[in-house]
């Protein structure tokens, strides 16, 4: 109530969320205390660097309704994984944020029929690729304006990097010639859209790991992903 009646409009409210994985007693709390100012209004310039595994996901964010209308957000219909677009495309329109250090959302993962289950994601890989390409398009199209806000651009670029990694490792995990070709095509698409962004991503740790040659290289890629799953607690 206090924020709603203030002189500045609150564009995005952020809170913690908890991964609760089926069969595991330990819960993984995703919080932002060392990244965002706590319980006060702030802007992108006030944010610290987002570490790997800490991103603003749908479980942790509430946008101002008018902002979503003004930014023209339109999610693809009959498509899974569009939550990545939901927490990506409105960001250039976000000026004022507030971080509520409370475990507000509990995300239950690990069920076999869940949309983020690895096997299910591989079966819907074309939808994951579609979302990834839309994110590439959006970042490249907005880049000239985004680079003026260094912290915002860095965050959006890093978030696209993790989505590229997820798409790549799922295609590698499938292992079919068709899916390996789709992985190659996805990286070529990024290269065609923005060669500088492609080189930054391709020469990074995650991009390099996802593009190691041969069967042995692909095995290393998957093992690296498994380690990240254990470290960050995601599905």
Indicate where each model-derived feature is located.
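Catalytic core of nucleotide-sugar-dependent glycosyltransferases
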Residues: 102-111, 117-146, 163-166, 173-196
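Gram-positive cell-envelope targeting signals
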Residues: 1, 73, 91-94, 100, ...
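Inter-domain helical "communication" segments and dimerization helices
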Residues: 9, 22-37, 47, 126-130, ...
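Inter-helical turn/loop segments and adjacent helix faces that build the functional surface
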Residues: 75, 142-151
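Membrane-interface aromatic/basic loop that binds lipid-linked glycans or pyrophosphate carriers
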Residues: 172-235
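Amphipathic alpha-helical repeat scaffolds of TPR domains
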Residues: 154-170
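Donor-binding/catalytic cores of nucleotide-activated saccharide
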Residues: 1-98, 105, 109-122
